[in-house]
Every structure is written in structure tokens, then in C-alpha cells.
UniProtKB/Swiss-Prot annotation:
The lineage of its organism: Bacteria, Pseudomonadati, Pseudomonadota, Gammaproteobacteria, Thiotrichales. It is found in: Cytoplasm. It comes from the Bacteria. The gene is secB1. One of its GO terms (biological process) is protein folding. This is Protein-export protein SecB 1. One of the proteins required for the normal export of preproteins out of the cell cytoplasm. It is a molecular chaperone that binds to a subset of precursor proteins, maintaining them in a translocation-competent state. It also specifically binds to its receptor SecA.
Length: 149
């Protein structure tokens, strides 16, 4: 098998596409007992770029922490990467864009959120690992189920 036929995956660039942090109740939140309730949301988008076999994957991680019935803080990061994915079947490329790439980006997104939280004066936030393979398989199943109905 020649070199060109081998599956290829390469990280071209990893970057923060968008970042935000807010403390909507800063006048009240500092005087309450700290018993945080964490809410997270993840989204993955992948876009084909003009360069051959090149894609941008964007992982959006939203975090909202409530304390004593009010929002303590909200943080959002859109962690992006440009990846070259070549010599793979379409199903493998889709998996790379929507499961493998987000897995790489999640480390950076978690770090960005943690840094924002600490800079905001709150205790460090350690987010749990995410199984992007399982999320991708679930999305495939949901897509197949919706096509059957």
C-alpha cells in the first residue's frame, strides 16, 4: 500500500473562536453559602473548508452554575480546530469530525472554562470527561430513528 492510500489525520490549528463569562448576580452571590449546582451543554459543528480534505470543527461548551436559587456565573467557549482528514471512507470522516476532533478540543475548552472561573473569583471548576464516541453514536441513532418515522 502506498503512502497516499494510508488514512491521514493532522491537526492544523487549535484556537478559541469565541469566549464569554458573566456574573449576573455579582451584587448578591458573594454573600451566600457556596453550594453550587452545575449545568453544562455541549454542541459540535463541523464545516468543510475550501482546502482539500480540510475541516473546521467547533466545540461549544456552555456552563451555568447556580447557587442558592440564583445564577452564580455563566461561561461559554467555542473551541475550534482545523483538521486534515484524508484517505478515509465518508463514515470514518464523519466520525473524525464529530467525535475524534471534539475529543481533542474538549481538553482545551475545559481549561479555558476553568481559567475563566478562577479569574472570576470562584473555586476551580473541574469538568468531567465526555464520551464523544457515545454522543456521536446516539446522534446517528436519533437520525436513523427520525428517518423511519
Amino acid at each position: 500500500m502506498d503512502q497516499q492510500a494510508q488514512p491521514q489525520f493532522q491537526i492544523q490549528k487549535v484556537y478559541v473562536k469565541d469566549l464569554s463569562f458573566s456574573i449576573p448576580n455579582s451584587d448578591k452571590i458573594w454573600t451566600t453559602n457556596w453550594k453550587p449546582e452545575l449545568h453544562t451543554d455541549l454542541k459540535v459543528e463541523a464545516t468543510k473548508l475550501p482546502e482539500e480534505n480540510t475541516y473546521e470543527t467547533v466545540l461549544t461548551l456552555e456552563v451555568k452554575v447556580e447557587n442558592d436559587g440564583m445564577v452564580a456565573f455563566e461561561a461559554e467557549v467555542k473551541q475550534a480546530g482545523i483538521f486534515t482528514v484524508a484517505n478515509m471512507q465518508e463514515a470514518q470522516i464523519e466520525h473524525a469530525k464529530k467525535a475524534f476532533c471534539p475529543n481533542i478540543l474538549y481538553h482545551y475548552a475545559r481549561e479555558a472554562i476553568s481559567d475563566l472561573v478562577i479569574s472570576g473569583g470562584f473555586p476551580q471548576l473541574c469538568l468531567s470527561a465526555v464520551n464523544f464516541d457515545a454522543m456521536y453514536q446516539d446522534s446517528l441513532k436519533e437520525s436513523a430513528d427520525s428517518k423511519q418515522h
